[in-house]
Each structure stands twice: as C-alpha cells, then as structure tokens.
C-alpha cells in the first residue's frame, strides 16, 4: 500500500513539474554578453636613453597634449544621454454592403400543366443582403530619459565604436538593471564626451528588475498554464 502511494506521489510530482515547464515563459535579455570591457595592455616600452619616452604603457594613461578626450580605444568610457520618446498610432476602417434580388415565374403554362404550375404556383422570389462594418485602432507610447556611462568594447573597421554598459540600483529587497548597447559614430560625440541615444545605431535599451515587487507583477505558472489551454 505504501509502495503504491509512493509511486502515485512521484507521478504527481513529475506531472506538476511538466506543467510548470509548459507554462514557463523564457525571457531573453536584449543586451547579451559582457557589459564592460577592459583596455588591452600595451607592450612594455623600450628605453632609448631620452628623458621623454614617446612610447608609454597604456596603463599610465598617456595621451598626446593636443588630443581631445573622446573615446577611441577599447576600455574608454562614454556617457549616453537617454532621450527616447516614441509614439505610434494606427487606425483602420472597412465597410462592405451587398444586396441581391431574384424573381422567377411562368407567364404562360400549357393546359395540361395548369394544375401543377398554374395560378402562380411556380413563382419564386428571393432576396438577400449582406452588410459588414469594421473598425480598428492602436496607440503606443514609450518615454525613457536619463544618463548611463558605457564602455567601448569593440572598435569597428570604419572607426565606429561599439559600446555596452550596465547600471545596477539596489532598492530595499529589489535590484533594478539598466543595460545599453549600440554603435556610436565618433563624429556625434560632443566635447563633454556625451552622445544622445537617438544618434546611436542598433541601440538596445533594457530596464528590468528582480525582487518581490517584480515577482508580484508576473503571472503565476499555473495561471499561465490554464491561460495557454483556455480556448477563450
């Protein structure tokens, strides 16, 4: 008896786990991979007997006197000014109408068919109509503002910079993550080392969180399971 109960419990547990897997909705992050990059260490300088050494290790932060501070190497930082304001609106309507009418009868009927078709017994009249009206509309709005400092993780062959960055903010028992990646044209970088997000190509902005507040906003796995199975 106990053995059968154990088998029943095991089967029930497997069934519940299977239902959980069917109802689970995978979440793929927009910004994948590492969210930071370290500068590549340069070769050790070779002493040439001069007081000024033109070849300095990259870790020393050497920079020519007349060169600006704009990022151009892997590991350089850049501030992204988030200025996303996107809105979309769509509406559509359709009207269709159709009417039809048909009459059929015998004006003259032979005498031997009078009993069957006479006195308008064979007259047929049919009419029909069909009307369709449809309307639809959709509105969407998205606003995102703020600043985020990112790191150059790749220098493309045409001189553009691929940047990636992340900011984590812990609030009570939850953590907010802001991730960003995209391709920046160095010509769009201002003198203050900033660039608006509207001028970043292939921009990917992700704002997610974890904790009990984020979990409260998600539908339970059992509800999602019945929602997927419900025909309504």
From Swiss-Prot:
It comes from the Bacteria. Keywords: Bacterial flagellum, Cell outer membrane, Lipoprotein, Membrane, Palmitate, Signal. The keyword Signal applies. A lipid is attached at residue 22 (N-palmitoyl cysteine). The basal body constitutes a major portion of the flagellar organelle and consists of four rings (L,P,S, and M) mounted on a central rod. PANTHER family: FLAGELLAR L-RING PROTEIN (PTHR34933:SF3). It is a lipid-anchor. Residues 1-21 form the signal peptide. A lipid is attached at residue 22 (S-diacylglycerol cysteine). GO terms for cellular component: bacterial-type flagellum basal body, distal rod, L ring; cell outer membrane. One of its GO terms (biological process) is bacterial-type flagellum-dependent cell motility. It is found in: Cell outer membrane; Bacterial flagellum basal body. Assembles around the rod to form the L-ring and probably protects the motor/basal body from shearing forces during rotation. Belongs to the FlgH family. Its main location: membrane. It holds the Pfam family FlgH. The lineage of its organism: Bacteria, Pseudomonadati, Pseudomonadota, Gammaproteobacteria, Enterobacterales. The keyword Signal applies. This is Flagellar L-ring protein. GO terms for molecular function: cytoskeletal motor activity. NCBIfam families: PRK00249.1-1 (NF001301).
């Amino acid at each position: 008896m106990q053995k059968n109960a154990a088998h029943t419990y095991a089967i029930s547990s497997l069934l519940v786990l299977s239902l959980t897997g069917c109802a689970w909705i995978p979440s793929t992050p927009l910004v994948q991979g590492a969210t930071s990059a370290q500068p590549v260490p340069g070769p050790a300088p070779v002493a040439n007997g001069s007081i000024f050494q033109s070849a300095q290790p990259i870790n020393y932060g050497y920079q020519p006197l007349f060169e600006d501070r704009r990022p151009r190497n892997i590991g350089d930082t850049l501030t992204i000014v988030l200025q996303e304001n996107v809105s979309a609106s769509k509406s559509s309507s359709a009207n269709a109408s159709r009417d039809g009418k048909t009459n059929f009868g015998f004006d003259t009927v032979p005498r031997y068919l009078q009993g069957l078709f006479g006195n308008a017994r064979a007259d047929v009249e049919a009419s029909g109509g069909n009307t369709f009206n449809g309307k639809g509309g959709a509105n969407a709005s998205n606003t995102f503002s703020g600043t985020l400092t990112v790191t150059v993780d790749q220098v493309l062959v045409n001189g553009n910079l691929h940047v990636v960055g992340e900011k984590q903010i812990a609030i009570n028992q939850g953590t907010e993550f802001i991730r960003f990646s995209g391709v920046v044209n160095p010509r769009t970088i201002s003198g203050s080392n900033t660039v608006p997000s509207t001028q970043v190509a292939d921009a990917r902005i992700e704002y997610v969180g974890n904790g009990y507040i984020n979990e409260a906003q998600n539908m339970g796995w059992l509800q999602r399971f019945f929602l997927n199975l419900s025909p309504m």
